[in-house]
From Swiss-Prot:
UniProt enzyme class: transferase
Keywords: DNA-directed RNA polymerase, Nucleotidyltransferase, Transcription, Transferase
Protein name: DNA-directed RNA polymerase subunit epsilon
Single GO BP term: DNA-templated transcription
Organism domain of life: Bacteria
Gene name in the database record: rpoY
Gene Ontology MF terms: DNA binding; DNA-directed RNA polymerase activity
Keyword Transcription: yes
HAMAP family hit by this protein: RNApol_bact_RpoY (MF_01553)
Gene3D superfamilies: RNAP, epsilon subunit-like (3.10.20.730)
EC number, as in UniProt: 2.7.7.6
Organism: Levilactobacillus brevis (strain ATCC 367 / BCRC 12310 / CIP 105137 / JCM 1170 / LMG 11437 / NCIMB 947 / NCTC 947)
First and last residue of the signal peptide: none
Amino acid sequence: MIYKVYYQNDQKRNPKREDTHSLYLEAPTEVEARALVEAHTEHNIEFIEAIEGETLAYEQQNPNYKLTEFSE
């Protein structure tokens, strides 16, 4: 499953919508997607959304779409 992870770069500052970023990640479950991001980044995760079907096709049209892979 592909997940879109919305996050802030810094865990110490209060989240601001204008500073929200996103990344795309392939993981078996939402819990595992969260664990991967937490283990490999300092991001403050706001929301994780499973995307598939037409939504995924739409996201893939964005030139900034790229699956993030973390090395173990």
